[in-house]
Amino acid sequence: MGFRLWLSYMKKIFCSFIFWISIFLTAITASFHLYYEPNASVDTVDALLLLLHLDAFRKIIPLFAAFPFAAQFAKEWKSRMFDSIIYRSNVKSYATAQTVACVVSSFLVCFLGLLLFLGYARLQKPLYTGSFYPVAPYGIWLENGLPWMYLLIVSSIFSLSCTLWSMCGLALSAFFPNIY
């Protein structure tokens, strides 16, 4: 029952309009500094690192990562549908399905949004010019001529941190329910 429950949550989230809008909002937010400050970064790797070091953008993106699951959870909470789900399955299956759905959806929103941003940045700038010394431990990918691997790893790590914040939001909303 747990896998089917999780699968139904994932179908609901992936078919929702807010999931796809959140991905595009993440990409647009990440691309702001390329539009307003086109000379601030020299290549795509530098553009991603600049994004990850700007506090305002780094704080907004986890909100977009939490939107799809939060909307689904709020809809379920308001309609009290979780009572019948828990009655048909059990609390452990329900909590596991909610947790995994939150993790997967928030990771995908952030990661796919960053991939869209990287694609846009790649259209604007070269991939990697070797203009700065790579930072350990992942800079080895840049030294070995694999900048895409470096970009994927750094994007994955940032997406995991956004997932952590989404999970904190889920935990807080489960302990302190708000009807608004």
Question: Over which residues does each language-model region extend?
Answer:
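Short hydrophobic/aromatic segments of transmembrane alpha-helices and their interfaces
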Residues: 1-4, 76, 162-164
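Secretory targeting signals
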Residues: 28-71, 96-174
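Aromatic- and glycine-rich beta-strand/loop motifs that create alpha-glucan
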Residues: 1-22
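Pore- or pathway-lining transmembrane helices of multi-pass membrane proteins that form conduits
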Residues: 21-22, 176-180
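Helix-to-coil boundary motifs at intracellular loop junctions of multi-pass secondary transporters
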Residues: 76, 174-175
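Helix-loop-helix units of permease transmembrane domains in multi-pass membrane transporters
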Residues: 72-105
